[in-house]
């Protein structure tokens, strides 16, 4: 393992307490963006303001426990890398479908089922490896980056229902994003480490100046003290086979996403990274499944690794999992502090947009690096290209896909789910006719270098092998043939 240039603290290192704390706060601010998904579910379910506050508090507990589980380093569960958790749009479509079909209890019950499905998939990952190759994981990461960028632009522009853009939102997002980029690119030390946190603070200040944020919004609901045990009276669980397919697809998409995120975390920690280490990935998927089941039990929608935080870790150079433990522990503790929940959900929309847009650049490029590290023939190019195009179309032509059958809407409503499903299915189809073993016969007096190179490179692309591996294979084969036969001409 070789330490990458720009990595300040690796997964196994423990930074000074001050750096751990500020890094954890930075990740917590980024993760707070995902609390919008439980809020959407709570509002769609028609819960009261007090119940919505309880949902946010319970969701903070869930996100804290999930982060600790995924970052944990153990033999059976956890990734061992800084891979914080966050609520995800993957489960939003299936959850809304279940909500309209059977209410909040069906959402929570099927979230538990989806978590158990993901937990059951974990030990089978090695056998499923041919169906989930690294280039597919890279594609999923790239789609996630693109999705975050689209969402970030929407928040930054403050687009209204009529399609109008709000100048104040653009100003706040522009100031916040500029601070993040300038500090990340042209500064060093403390300023570079906490560029996102400083950008967020700047965004809050700009929002207050332009009237987009008021400190009074941080006040807890009337009658609620400083410490408050969330009420669980609104919780219930039910199950319906009609929602099994959408939640199953979401579980598979969540599995691919965390596989990609952990692979990205591994790559950020090792300059000589070549392929995913499946022991770590298996533990991460098991942790994610257990975390999603826990979310369903405490009244939250499904959860997943948070790609933005993985990208944030790479951008700041701090990948220590102790940061994840700290962020998770603080989140779990703040679940019992109502004002903390209000602070998390009151972040101005343009500031959220700036954070999403900033980290999307690192996520997208990481995914594309994983894809382009492999040799791609016509089959693999078709899988990657078609799947990426379908994911883009899901965002551009959302109104068109809204006409899909009700059972398929959870797939077509989400670009990540649609792109993932297309990639997995196309990969299965394109494997037809691909042989695991191939042979090239050469005449003793006609050992041509070009024929050998062409044979190895064509099959390397068919198998999506890394270019450096194929190049070494070509060199080795050529050397052997030069020894046992006529020198290649």
Model segments located where?
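Membrane-embedded alpha-helical modules
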Residues: 98-216, 328-433
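Conserved ATP-binding N-box helix of the HATPase_c
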Residues: 467-489
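Membrane-embedded helical hairpins/re-entrant loop segments and their flanking transmembrane helices
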Residues: 8, 15-18, 42-61, 65-78, ...
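Bergerat-fold GHKL ATPase/HATPase_c domain
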Residues: 431-475
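Short, non-helical or kinked segments that cap or interrupt transmembrane helices
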Residues: 54-55, 76-89, 130-139, 191-197, ...
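Hydrophobic transmembrane alpha-helices of multi-pass solute/ion transporters
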Residues: 1-14, 179-182, 196-248, 403-413
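Hydrophobic, membrane-embedded alpha-helices of multi-pass small-molecule transporters
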Residues: 18-34, 166-176, 194, 210, ...
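Juxtamembrane interface elements at the cytosolic ends of transmembrane helices
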Residues: 34-38, 42, 176-186, 194, ...
């Amino acid at each position: 393992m070789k330490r990458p240039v720009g990595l300040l603290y690796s997964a196994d290192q423990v930074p000074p307490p001050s750096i751990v704390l500020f890094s954890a706060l930075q990740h917590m601010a980024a993760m707070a963006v995902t609390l919008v998904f439980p809020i959407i579910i709570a509002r769609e379910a028609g819960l009261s303001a007090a119940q919505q506050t309880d949902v946010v508090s319970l969701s903070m507990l869930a996100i804290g426990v999930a982060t600790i589980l995924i970052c944990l380093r153990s033999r059976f569960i956890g990734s061992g890398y800084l891979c914080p958790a966050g609520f995800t749009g993957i489960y939003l479509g299936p959850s809304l479908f279940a909500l309209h079909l059977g209410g909040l209890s069906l959402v929570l019950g099927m979230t538990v089922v989806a978590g158990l499905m993901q937990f059951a998939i974990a030990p089978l990952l090695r056998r499923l490896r041919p169906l989930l190759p690294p280039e597919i994981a890279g594609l999923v990461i790239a789609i996630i980056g693109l999705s975050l960028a689209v969402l970030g632009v929407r928040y930054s522009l403050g687009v209204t229902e009529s399609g109008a853009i709000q100048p104040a939102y653009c100003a706040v997002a522009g100031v916040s994003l500029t601070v993040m980029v300038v500090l990340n690119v042209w500064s060093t030390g403390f300023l570079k480490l906490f560029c996102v946190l400083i950008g967020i603070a700047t965004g809050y200040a700009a929002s207050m100046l332009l009237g987009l944020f008021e400190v009074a919004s941080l006040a807890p609901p009337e009658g609620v003290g400083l410490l408050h045990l969330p009420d669980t009276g609104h919780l219930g669980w039910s199950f319906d086979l009609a929602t099994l397919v959408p939640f199953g697809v979401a579980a598979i998409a969540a599995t691919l996403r965390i596989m990609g995120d952990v692979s990205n975390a591994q790559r950020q920690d090792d300059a000589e990274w070549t392929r995913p280490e499946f022991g770590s990935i298996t533990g991460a998927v098991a942790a994610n499944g257990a975390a999603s089941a826990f979310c369903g039990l405490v009244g939250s929608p499904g959860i997943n690794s948070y790609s933005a935080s993985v990208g944030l870790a790479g951008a700041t150079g701090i990948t220590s999992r102790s940061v994840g433990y700290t962020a998770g522990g603080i989140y779990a503790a703040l679940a019992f502090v109502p004002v903390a929940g209000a602070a998390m959900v009151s972040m101005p929309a343009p500031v959220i947009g700036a954070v999403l847009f900033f980290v999307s650049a690192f996520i997208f490029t990481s995914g594309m690096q994983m894809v382009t590290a492999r040799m791609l023939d016509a089959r693999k190019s078709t899988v990657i290209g078609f799947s990426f195009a379908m994911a883009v179309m899901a965002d551009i032509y959302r109104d068109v896909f809204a006409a899909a059958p009700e059972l398929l809407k959870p797939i077509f409503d989400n670009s990540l789910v649609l792109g993932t499903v297309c990639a997995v299915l196309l990969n299965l189809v394109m494997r037809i006719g691909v042989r695991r073993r191939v042979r090239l016969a050469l005449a003793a007096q006609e050992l041509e270098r070009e024929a050998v190179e062409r044979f190895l490179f064509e099959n390397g692309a068919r198998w999506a092998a890394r270019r450096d591996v194929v190049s070494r294979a070509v060199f080795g084969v050529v050397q052997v043939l030069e020894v046992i036969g006529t020198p290649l001409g």
